[in-house]
């Protein structure tokens, strides 16, 4: 796009937009790998090309700024491409929770007014059953791991890889208003129908910067830095996998995407790709640790942030006995989500393992730029003494 010419002394209003997160990895680590299961390996350089191709392909399908593109996909490099291409165009990415009932999926897609659906072939039967009820959807793009189109009566307008192959490698991503809506998803933590949540480019970038500092700057256990190998184990449809794919991309780390969560595949990838950093809910950690495939697996390099529900002390101890570093993070869908992390302070690192367990399973302390207070019914602050009960109130620049 044509850049604005600034007059001498005129300040430049630098927009906090998602495309800026790709700048540094393309300078520092353009040839570092992004891996999908045991099927695909690309570099950051190729990732950037594919993001540009996807934006061009979606444009050919009629996607315009302000439109909504819905994704039904497992954790993959393709989902990561959607994380950048769709918002970068000025459109909105809807990350569809395919675990919802068919009725709730219809409600959320219609409520979001999705124009295009990008769907993994695994979900074709689900989509086929509800397609006639999706009143705003005009186009369907099929994702297939083997590049083949399965037989389906569903009208499919393009296959993902074919769409990219037929598209140019350069798209002129605009300098959007940073308050442009980037993503939307629906939370079921309420009564009635799922409630929509959305985040702007500014909110996502600020959350990314804050959590990057929280997990990388402090001398503590579950650090994530540029020499780590990252694998999400929280679905990318759920609050952008807690925002960590954006963090991993900003840092330019090697990324490993497991697709469908299968213990054998996850453990295979952890060992083969030397994964060092993940995040998940307690049930996923337990699924992995109790899998027969975990018996002889070396998990001693693995660091895992746990959220979504309370981490049982026994499960934390089981993980540590396998050499895994674990701690807890806290947040909500509406907070993007991370608000606090149970990073032990430096002096706590010298404590014995049993004493440290009592620290890492707690909610933790606020991450940088997050203000958190406990208040009484009159909104008066209460002491942070580990005993007093009140209502949690919070404020951040991305809320």
Segment roles from a protein language model:
Residues 250, 272-280, 289-358, 371, ...:
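Gly/Ser/Thr-rich phosphate-binding loop
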